[in-house]
Design a protein with these regions (language model features):
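Catalytic cores and adjacent flexible loops of soluble metabolic enzymes
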Residues: 1-194
């Protein structure tokens, strides 16, 4: 993994608490990825309702990956898992026997070239963790899943404030574009496709 990028992306417990408070004030559900057991314990103290497992944790190559997965599993809370770097889905399912799991199709490139998406593979997953630019990929994924008859379609998209300089800013969409994407997805969800 690119440790410099990862370190720049890390948030402190203090920042997590601030973000949780802002989310609570705006009726937005807060959850995030935990990369070590102490982070899970801290997120539990914030009373998060679900967890996100990043692709690199699924590979079990980070120093505390296995312990972190087991800590999240003990919470029995819903868990979103990005499979962008691979990982053994069957093994991960064994770790989480009592959690509602959402496995997301993902390619861990920032930004991701639209042409690299394998739609046939993507629709085999419960959700889509998207790193492409723009709104096309999430809209296509939602349409394909809706056509399959899926009712609960999960989309993960990195967003930023205008002029943000964060490490994933080049592959993130601003809040105006995000709002347009949500409106398009809601139209698809309320359409009859089959």
């Amino acid at each position: 993994p690119d440790w410099d990028f990862i370190k720049k992306s890390e948030i402190t417990f203090k920042t997590a608490k601030k973000l949780k408070d802002v989310c609570d004030d705006h009726n937005i559900e807060f959850y995030c990825s935990a990369f070590y057991p102490e982070a899970v314990m801290y997120l539990e103290s914030l009373n998060v309702k679900k967890y996100k497992i990043a692709s690199r944790t699924c590979l079990l190559k980070d120093p505390f990956s296995k312990e972190t997965l087991k800590c999240v599993a003990k919470t029995k809370k819903p868990t979103i898992i990005s499979m962008g770097m691979g990982g053994d889905k069957k093994y991960i399912k064994k770790i989480f026997p009592k959690n509602k799991m959402t496995f997301c199709y993902c390619i861990s490139e920032y930004p991701l070239s639209f042409q690299k998406i394998n739609w046939k593979d993507a629709i085999q997953f419960d959700g889509f963790s998207d790193h492409t630019l723009g709104v096309s990929a999430p809209i296509i994924y939602t349409t394909l899943k809706k056509y399959q008859g899926s009712r609960n379609i999960m989309i993960e998209k990195h967003i930023k404030l205008k002029n943000s300089k964060g490490p994933d800013a080049p592959s993130s969409m601003d809040t105006d574009e995000f709002s347009k994407m949500i409106k398009s997805i809601r139209l698809i969800e309320n359409s009859k496709l089959n």
